[in-house]
Design a protein with these regions (language model features):
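Pyridoxal 5′-phosphate
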Residues: 1-414
């Protein structure tokens, strides 16, 4: 098994790029340019090797066996929880809940905390730029409880209207659930300020960190949020696994979301008592391999350094905006002063799906569509955008290929 991520004193991203085998192949006869990182990041060889090692030599169920192999798997599984606690600077490893992803994490909070604490007329504040995963669960709970959804509007530049947000807050506000970085626009929202204002109003907060956790240092205690959610596959880990951070006192007051093995204390046909946090929220056989894979991904990202990653990606985004700005007819959707990873754009006479198809024929992978964010598409009066999303293993040559590909595609519509 290879050592955890190569440590490079002055980070050499050209060397790091070599650790991603998927990037070194051809698609449709062209070298692959992967610019769909907001949908899913790629996996370095270190993470793939760690998963392979687990499946070959450690595979066993956790928490339930006295034999050595089970104990070994359990140790690796629970070590992941501790690593993630440290990675996001949570106060207690028992505040880390393993889920199937960001969507599952939000549903857990909505159904466990929301169904317990919302009443008719209570208010949940979201933003106009939310991913559907941070809209639909709250709508479903609101329909059952009589709660009301309020929405923070977005300005023409793609930024939240914070003054409008302040006016939305009221004594009836029970939850403020906000995306940290927009997957459709790239906007970095001022979550620390949003959380502080919510707390002043007596509300609880949830931050959707799916697009922020791969791109910058996350300090939960500094942000001050009550809940924070993210997915493994956005940060070089396996799919089907995610994290819910929850403030321990809130988690301890919340009922279980699902029933089954491991989340119980005692079971009879008359009654069941539940396990302690975090296990009461982790019913059934957990995604053991995925947790170990994310643990390795955390080691990998930490070895590079999140500050170095943020610096590298900021330079690439600035370069992409500069080069794309020179393309006649291209219009950006979302031009916030603070943005990360995502560059979203349209052409008035070229549909995003047509552009994406032509780019794919040149080996360039981008995302087209509404990006599971239909409300923000309606806000900007567009049916879809083309989204190029950048990771630390991308380079200027990838951006140049994108620009060349767009100019080639334009020739079909002129």
């Amino acid at each position: 098994m290879q050592e955890t991520a190569t440590k490079i004193s002055a980070v050499d991203f050209d060397e790091i790029r070599k650790e991603f085998p998927v990037l070194h192949q051809e698609m449709n006869g062209h070298p692959l340019v992967y610019l769909d990182n907001a949908a899913s990041s790629q996996m370095p060889v270190q993470v793939a090797d760690r998963l392979d090692y687990y499946h070959r030599f450690e595979h066993s169920n956790v928490h339930r066996g006295i034999h050595t192999l089970s104990q070994r798997a359990t140790d690796s599984y629970e070590a992941a929880r501790k690593k993630i606690q440290v990675f996001i600077n949570a106060a207690d490893e028992n505040e880390i809940i393993f889920t199937s992803g960001t969507t599952d994490s939000i549903n857990l909070v909505a159904n466990s905390y929301g169904m317990t604490n919302f009443s008719k007329g209570d208010e949940v504040i979201l933003t106009e730029m939310e991913h559907h995963a941070n809209i639909v669960p709250w709508q479903m709970v609101a329909q059952k409880t009589g709660a009301i959804i309020k929405v923070i509007p977005v300005t023409d530049s793609g930024e939240l209207d914070i003054e409008a947000y302040k006016k939305l807050l009221s004594p009836r506000t029970k939850m403020v659930s906000v995306i940290h970085i927009s997957n459709a626009l790239g906007t970095i929202n001022p979550v620390k300020e949003i959380v502080a204002l919510a707390h002043e109003a007596g509300a609880v907060t949830l931050i959707d960190g799916a697009q922020s956790i791969p791109h910058q240092n996350i300090d939960i205690q500094d942000i001050g949020t009550d809940f924070y959610v993210f997915s493994s596959h956005k940060m070089c880990g396996p799919t089907g696994f995610g994290i819910l951070y929850g403030r321990k006192d809130l988690l301890e007051a919340m009922p279980p979301y699902r029933g089954g093995g491991d989340m119980i204390d005692k079971v009879s046909f008359e009654e069941t008592t539940y396990n302690v946090v975090p296990f009461r929220f982790e019913a059934g056989t957990p995604p053991i391999a995925a947790s170990i894979g994310l643990s390795e991904a955390v080691d990998y990202l930490s070895a590079i350094g999140m500050d170095a990653i943020e610096t590298q990606e900021t330079k690439l985004v600035e370069y992409a905006v500069q080069e794309l700005s020179a393309i006649n007819g291209l219009r950006f959707i979302g031009e916030a002063k603070k943005r990360a990873s995502v560059v979203s754009f349209v052409f008035d006479h070229i549909h995003a799906s047509d552009l994406g198809t032509i780019l794919d024929k040149q080996g360039i992978a981008v995302r087209t569509g509404h990006h599971c964010a239909q409300p923000i598409m309606r806000r900007f009066n567009v049916p879809a955008t083309t989204r190029a999303s950048i990771a630390f293993y991308n380079n200027k040559e990838d951006v140049d290929r994108l620009v060349e590909g767009i100019n080639y595609a334009k020739s079909f519509f002129e």
